[in-house]
From Swiss-Prot:
Record GO biological process: rRNA methylation
Described function: Specifically dimethylates two adjacent adenosines (A1518 and A1519) in the loop of a conserved hairpin near the 3'-end of 16S rRNA in the 30S particle. May play a critical role in biogenesis of 30S subunits.
Disulphide linkage map: none
Assigned GO CC terms: cytosol
Annotated keywords: Cytoplasm, Methyltransferase, RNA-binding, rRNA processing, S-adenosyl-L-methionine, Transferase
Taxonomic source organism: Haemophilus influenzae (strain ATCC 51907 / DSM 11121 / KW20 / Rd)
Name of the protein described by the UniProt record: Ribosomal RNA small subunit methyltransferase A
Main location: cytoplasm
Compartments, as annotated in UniProt: Cytoplasm
Binding site for S-adenosyl-L-methionine: 18, 20, 45, 66, 91, 118
Top EC category: transferase
Length: 287
């Protein structure tokens, strides 16, 4: 029976809750994070504390961001960690990680945020995009995600998994798969396989762009029409002559270009923006 109740709490579908309970998987994740006593760690979606407890035992202090009111209250009264925990009851999608970095004076301490969590799969992609905005104040991130999302994060050009999420993630971070996790490690068991990924923000961006909007825009337009040649998919942004001058094969498709190519296209658009552009539009995060 795949019960939705675990440790007295019923998983809430609207929060995408699946609670990790497999001890060997938990140990593997904690070993990958390798928390140290004086570091500033932030857990997103601590849930019932499967990762909170073993990490909390190894550090001096742990900040957790939890949207579920009942779970946040449980953590505030945790039997042996409550004095170590700062519980922030809010939506991680709206949370200002930069303000936390400033509030804790981490720059003066020579530290950055170390972020980890078992992310709700229904918001994992937009949450990743939110976190990338704070790449300069984050030391590293370790996340449990849907296995297919991890494949996309780690993908190389010329593969089916390669897409906008790949480019945006690898633009900001070095991305490494850590371990795969079966559905049986959770309660209730999800219908998909999971995996843990490590993201380490680049100290210096290898392919900096002048305006991130244009990197998002060109990737969205290319991958939303990934079966088309770039000559056709990007026709509203570039003439064939422009693409050729930028070293782009007109018959190539979205997955054939490296991050450096997309950065070059984005920088050209920053200098030569189309007249009818609306930079306030919301870019589609799907591919």
């Amino acid at each position: 029976m795949n019960s939705k109740k675990h440790l007295g709490h019923t998983a809430r579908k609207r929060f995408g809750q699946n609670f990790l309970h497999d001890t060997s998987v938990i140990q593997g994740i904690v070993a990958a994070i390798y928390p140290q006593p004086n570091q500033f760690l932030v857990e997103i979606g601590p849930g019932l504390g499967a990762l909170t407890e073993p990490v909390g035992e190894l550090v001096d202090h742990l900040t957790v961001v939890e949207l579920d009111r009942d779970l946040a209250e449980r953590l505030r009264h945790h039997p042996f960690l409550h004095q170590k925990l700062t519980v922030i009851e809010t939506d991680a999608m709206q949370f200002d990680f930069g303000a936390l970095y400033t509030k804790e004076n981490l720059a003066e301490k020579g530290q950055k945020l170390r972020v980890f969590g078992n992310l709700p799969y229904n918001i994992s992609t937009p949450l990743m995009f939110h976190l990338f905005k704070y790449h300069d104040v984050i030391q590293d991130m370790h996340f449990m995600l849907q296995k297919e999302v991890v494949k996309r994060l780690c993908a190389a050009p010329n593969s089916k998994a390669y897409g906008r999420l790949t480019i945006m993630a690898q633009y900001f971070c070095q991305v490494m798969p850590v371990l795969e996790v079966p559905p049986s490690a959770f309660k209730p068991a999800p219908k998909v396989d999971s995996a843990v990924v490590r993201l380490i923000p680049h100290k210096e961006l290898p392919h900096p762009v002048k305006d991130l909007y244009w990197l998002n825009r060109v990737c969205s337009q290319a991958f939303n029409q990934r079966r088309k040649t770039l000559r056709n998919a990007l026709s509203t942004l570039f003439s064939p002559e422009n693409l050729t001058a930028l070293g782009i094969d007109l018959n190539a498709r979205a997955e054939n270009l490296a991050i450096a190519d997309y950065a070059r296209l984005a920088n050209w658009l920053a200098d030569n923006p189309p007249a009818d552009v609306n930079k306030d539009e919301i870019l589609d995060s799907e591919e």
